[in-house]
Amino acid sequence: LPEQDFMRF
C-alpha cells in the first residue's frame, strides 16, 4: 500500500 494510505487514518 502507498505511504499516503496510512496517513488517511
UniProtKB/Swiss-Prot annotation:
Phenylalanine amide carried by residues: 9
One annotated Gene Ontology cellular component of this protein: extracellular region
Primary localization class, coarse: secreted
Organ and tissue specificity: Expressed in the CNS and thoracic perisympathetic organs (tPSO) but not in the ring gland, midgut or abdominal perisympathetic organs (aPSO) (at protein level).
Compartments where found: Secreted
GO aspect biological process, one term: neuropeptide signaling pathway
Keyword terms, alphabetized: Amidation, Neuropeptide, Secreted
Transmembrane helix recorded as keyword: no
Role: FMRFamides and FMRFamide-like peptides are neuropeptides.
Family membership noted in the UniProt record: Belongs to the FARP (FMRFamide related peptide) family.
Protein name: FMRFamide-like neuropeptide LPEQDFMRF-amide
Organism: Delia radicum (Cabbage root fly)
Upper classification of the organism: Eukaryota, Metazoa, Ecdysozoa, Arthropoda, Hexapoda
